[in-house]
Each structure stands twice: as structure tokens, then as C-alpha cells.
């Protein structure tokens, strides 16, 4: 299950405090998440997706969001948990295939040092 960033303030916190990584298709912001009162880190990651109206009409923007969501979902078990991710689609993304989007996302996550080649399973503490 993918947990989503939904509120505007959640996106704003990641933009202001997080680190950014970019390539031709995507911009990625990451921030280690802290949700509990005692400041423990969550055992899961959350993702938010932003696609500007400059990218295309609503059909194109929805396709971009679906491609990003599916790429994240299929790679979720290889990503280090406990981070908030915000992905921003750039204009060239609208004409790319799923495999190109997945390759771009994976390269950004590897650049951030959050990608493991081995599958990570959630183990309770």
C-alpha cells in the first residue's frame, strides 16, 4: 500500500526542509519523516505527486501521475523506508513510456542513496 502526502502543508514542509534531486523527466524532493509525538520515524514512506498545467491537458497530467505512482509502487520494496517523497513531473515526461519514467525515478532514488538492490521487507521492531 502506498501512503500519500495529501495536505498542502505536507508538501510545503518537504519543499522547504527536504533535499532535491533532478533529471530530465522528474524533480524529487525527499525528507526524513517524523510523525509521532516522541519523534520516532515511521516504518513506511509517503509520496506526493505534482504535475503542473504546463505539462499538458488533464488527460496528459493524469497519465503522468499514473506512471509516477506505478513506478513508485513497483519499486517500493527496494526503497529505504521512513522518507517523504515529492515527485514533480517535467514537460518531457508526457511523451515518455513507463519504462523511461521508471528508469528516471530509479536513478533519482539511487542518487539520493535510498535504493537497495535487495528487496526490503517490513519487520516489526
From Swiss-Prot:
The gene is rnpA. This is Ribonuclease P protein component. RNaseP catalyzes the removal of the 5'-leader sequence from pre-tRNA to produce the mature 5'-terminus. It can also cleave other RNA substrates such as 4.5S RNA. The protein component plays an auxiliary but essential role in vivo by binding to the 5'-leader sequence and broadening the substrate specificity of the ribozyme. Its EC number is 3.1.26.5. It holds the Pfam family Ribonuclease_P. The keyword Acetylation does not apply. One of its GO terms (molecular function) is ribonuclease P activity. One of its GO terms (biological process) is tRNA 5'-leader removal. Consists of a catalytic RNA component (M1 or rnpB) and a protein subunit. Keywords: Endonuclease, Hydrolase, Nuclease, RNA-binding, tRNA processing. It catalyses: Endonucleolytic cleavage of RNA, removing 5'-extranucleotides from tRNA precursor. GO terms for cellular component: ribonuclease P complex. It comes from Clostridium beijerinckii (strain ATCC 51743 / NCIMB 8052). Transmembrane segments: none annotated. Belongs to the RnpA family.
